[in-house]
Amino acid sequence: MTSYNPASPDFPFTLGIEEEYQVVDPQTRELRSYITQILDRGRMILREQIKPELHQSMVEVGTQPCRTIQEARAEVVRLRGTIAGLARQHGLTIISAGTHPISSWMSQEITPFERYKGVVEEMQQLALQLLIFGMHVHVGMPDDEVAIELMNVARYFLPHILALSTSSPFWMGRNTGFKSYRSALFSNFPRTGIPPSFHSAAEFQNYVKLLIKTNCIDDAKKIYWDLRPHPYFGTLEFRVCDAATRVDECIALAALMQALVVKLHLMFSENTTFRVYRRAVIMENKWRAQRWGLDGKLIDFGKRAEVEAKALMHELVAFVDEVVDELGSRHEVEYLLNVADGGSSADRQLAVFRETNDLHAVVDNLIVETLEGVPVYQG
């Protein structure tokens, strides 16, 4: 029998969080292509927990596997503080948001590694302009079959999670009209968006083998869906979120994803289930989430009606209520009620711009919010 208690040695639903940060010059407020200069020192401190990305103005970090949301918070705070400290030694800082409000992709340098040269060779301008930043959350799985079963039903909630995470309303100095322009940009890549459903782990593996055999991909990591079984970690990886600006938002979203997986697994164990919806209808909600975020309406396909997104976020928090106490994440999950009612990072960025008519002020506020409650590494 699967344990839902994180203290149990048999608890499978561990957490891992990956964040992609922007490297920024606090004077000009522009992105700086500087990751290679801080990477060596960063690896001495963080080892495999720091990685470069395609653009040199981005740095990726990843937590160790965590059993509780409190462990995950400590890891995220440590990683943000370390990267911010390394950047500060070079007169720079970091931002966590889905896009940079003013910088252009045309001014960015590509990281000179063979992997990234291959990406640019294949994707051409699509790769060069993919100056976006996300947060990925890994939830451990008991086995491959369970991962597919849970992916099939958890897909329904991806637009809800996206709406809560939106942090990319600006792009190259323009108000895009989207709450998550990052999602719109990423949709230009192949094998992105809401995943299809699969009848079994074997069917999914046959799909992967077909793509590899026909030279579509050379590795299952090039399946970039919003939710996927990770090919090496034994996790279900949520990839739908914009980068979370505040640590509190990052941790609340991760807690929700863990609780959602546990709730759905509990339903399976009690011989109840959640309907598997077609990708086409979930995509309708994803469009609404990336366009209007929490200010719009999503479709409740059970009721066959539009419902205010904010109301559905309250329903989602209530849906996972029976598991959050055992997981020890009630406080973190219920923080999302504040986000639902008060707005996401995208809403706050837009509010700053309305007040100041100055995107530099938006950048300044993002710098402050990214490091709220984060001791900056002084080594």
Swiss-Prot record:
UniProt cross-references to Gene3D superfamilies, sorted A to Z: 3.30.590.20
Q: Which GO terms describe its molecular function?
A: ATP binding; glutamate-cysteine ligase activity
Source organism's superkingdom? Answer: Bacteria
Q: What class of enzyme is it?
A: ligase
Q: Which UniProt keywords apply?
A: ATP-binding, Ligase, Nucleotide-binding
The catalytic activity, as recorded, is: L-cysteine + L-glutamate + ATP = gamma-L-glutamyl-L-cysteine + ADP + phosphate + H(+)
Q: Tell me the InterPro entries matching this sequence.
A: GCL_type2/YbdK_subfam, GCS2, Gln_synth/guanido_kin_cat_dom, YbdK
Keyword Ligase recorded:
yes
State the EC number(s): 6.3.2.2
Please indicate if the UniProt record lists Cytoplasm as a keyword: no
Q: Which GO terms describe its biological process?
A: modified amino acid biosynthetic process
Family of the protein in this entry: Belongs to the glutamate--cysteine ligase type 2 family. YbdK subfamily.
Function, in words: ATP-dependent carboxylate-amine ligase which exhibits weak glutamate--cysteine ligase activity.
Q: What is this protein called?
A: Putative glutamate--cysteine ligase 2
Please report the organism this UniProt entry assigns to the protein.
Roseiflexus castenholzii (strain DSM 13941 / HLO8)
